[in-house]
Curated annotation (Swiss-Prot):
Stated role: Apoprotein for the two 4Fe-4S centers FA and FB of photosystem I (PSI); essential for photochemical activity. FB is the terminal electron acceptor of PSI, donating electrons to ferredoxin. The C-terminus interacts with PsaA/B/D and helps assemble the protein into the PSI complex. Required for binding of PsaD and PsaE to PSI. PSI is a plastocyanin/cytochrome c6-ferredoxin oxidoreductase, converting photonic excitation into a charge separation, which transfers an electron from the donor P700 chlorophyll pair to the spectroscopically characterized acceptors A0, A1, FX, FA and FB in turn.
Residue intervals of the 4Fe-4S ferredoxin-type domain: 1-31, 39-68
GO MF: 4 iron, 4 sulfur cluster binding; electron transfer activity; metal ion binding; oxidoreductase activity
Residues bound to [4Fe-4S] cluster 1: C11, C14, C17, C58
Lineage: Bacteria, Bacillati, Cyanobacteriota, Cyanophyceae, Oscillatoriophycideae
Protein name: Photosystem I iron-sulfur center
Keyword Transit peptide: no
Catalytic EC class: oxidoreductase
Covalent S-S links between cysteines: none
Topology within the bilayer: Peripheral membrane protein
Pfam families hit by this protein: Fer4_7
Length: 81
């Protein structure tokens, strides 16, 4: 099941989220918008299982990466009304 993975421009290019992902959903790509000259990208969101390890690994104050779980996952986890 794929989930929406959103990477914000607050990404500092540290690679923590890429290393934390157990399914290699994320990768770093060149980007001139930060000091590291790279930013996380999510080319394989269809492989995302929604574990949110990437969110946990993100060191920025405002999480630079967010995983938005689909309605079916939210319901099966008992998070829906």
């Amino acid at each position: 099941m794929s989930h929406k993975v959103k990477i914000y421009d607050t990404c500092i290019g540290c690679t923590q989220c890429v290393r934390a992902c157990p399914l290699d959903v994320l990768e770093m790509v060149p980007w001139d918008g930060c000091k590291a000259s790279q930013i996380a990208s999510s080319p394989r969101t269809e492989d995302c299982v929604g574990c949110k390890r990437c969110e946990t690994a993100c060191p920025t104050d405002f999480l630079s990466i967010r995983v938005y779980l689909g309605a079916e996952t939210t319901r099966s986890m008992g998070l829906a009304y």
